[in-house]
Amino acid sequence: MVCFLIYITLLFIQRVYFISSEKKLTIHIVQMFQLLSQAFYNLKMFLMMDMLGVGDAININTNKNIRQVC
């Protein structure tokens, strides 16, 4: 969850920096809508994966692999 928030924050910072270097308002608005839609899509996918327990399955498999190596 923390990694997801950092990822979204970095995307937002990059967009804001790019927008501040541009002077066209329409480009700003379109890019902000694109950023918001991408952020909500990523959040939806993350929550769906979390509900399905994909993250737990990955952690369990990783732990099994570590035990086998040791």
UniProtKB/Swiss-Prot annotation:
InterPro entries: DUF5445. Pfam families: DUF5445. This is Uncharacterized protein YncH. It comes from Escherichia coli (strain K12).
